[in-house]
Amino acid sequence: MARLAGVDLPREKRMEIALTYIYGIGRTRSKEILDATGVSPDLRSKDLSDEDLAKLREYIEESLKVEGDLRREVQADIRRKIEIGCYQGLRHRRGLPVRGQRTKTNARTRKGPKRTIAGKKKAK
């Protein structure tokens, strides 16, 4: 099993897809990496030679911020926004959508499960 940036790549997937299992690499960046290193996107990760694997590892380590480093940077950016008290920081602190989405309905992912409020009871 090929291992890049601390992630085990799936053996049966094409390299173009397998690289997207690394946090910070999507389809477009995956294609860019494969073009720059000269590795065929149609190769399966189980068929990679050690030379190809070394090329990919070197390219990713030198020119990209992925996995742990990228996660730390994103968390640091969020913490900074919370500390300076900007609008986005307040939204992060309150657990609400940050990018202007509506909250009267929807926004359940950020707000969590519904809290039901007891309604008025009918008098007989």
Curated annotation (Swiss-Prot):
GO terms for cellular component: cytosol; small ribosomal subunit. Residues 95-124 are annotated as: Disordered. GO terms for biological process: translation. Part of the 30S ribosomal subunit. Forms a loose heterodimer with protein S19. Forms two bridges to the 50S subunit in the 70S ribosome. Gene3D superfamilies: 1.10.8.50, 30s ribosomal protein s13, domain 2. This is Small ribosomal subunit protein uS13. The lineage of its organism: Bacteria, Bacillati, Actinomycetota, Actinomycetes, Mycobacteriales. It comes from Rhodococcus opacus (strain B4). Pfam families: Ribosomal_S13 (PF00416). Located at the top of the head of the 30S subunit, it contacts several helices of the 16S rRNA. In the 70S ribosome it contacts the 23S rRNA (bridge B1a) and protein L5 of the 50S subunit (bridge B1b), connecting the 2 subunits; these bridges are implicated in subunit movement. Contacts the tRNAs in the A and P-sites. Keywords: Ribonucleoprotein, Ribosomal protein, RNA-binding, rRNA-binding, tRNA-binding. Belongs to the universal ribosomal protein uS13 family. GO terms for molecular function: rRNA binding; structural constituent of ribosome; tRNA binding. The gene is rpsM.
